[in-house]
Curated annotation (Swiss-Prot):
Coiled coil: none annotated. It comes from the Bacteria. PANTHER family: UPF0125 PROTEIN RATB. NCBIfam families: PRK01777.1 (NF002490). Belongs to the UPF0125 (RnfH) family. Gene3D superfamilies: RnfH-like. InterPro entries: Mopterin_synth/thiamin_S_b, RnfH, RnfH_sf. This is UPF0125 protein XF_2346. HAMAP family: UPF0125_RnfH. It holds the Pfam family Ub-RnfH.
């Protein structure tokens, strides 16, 4: 289970029963900041909360974007 913020990353390993879903992993992990998640991914691929996990899957909690990526690039280009 992985959740990242601009200034830190939290990663934890949890053991689940065979056939466990993403929502089961999220509930078991009980990470701080989990309520900010707007979606889930497994190894960078978007999945639903009902996605069945396989052994070794890395579940990522996705946060909302703070700024549009195109706008961020424009701002960096102007300040460079």
């Amino acid at each position: 289970m992985l959740i990242a913020w601009p200034d830190r990353v939290h990663c934890c390993e949890i053991m689940l029963q065979e056939g466990a879903r993403v929502v089961d992993a999220v509930e078991m992990a009980a990470l701080n900041g989990i309520e900010q998640a707007v979606g889930y991914a497994v190894f960078g691929v978007l999945v639903t909360s009902d996605h069945v996990l396989n052994e070794g899957d890395r579940v990522e909690l996705l946060r909302p974007l703070l700024i549009d990526p195109k706008e961020a690039r424009r701002r960096r280009a102007v300040s460079a």
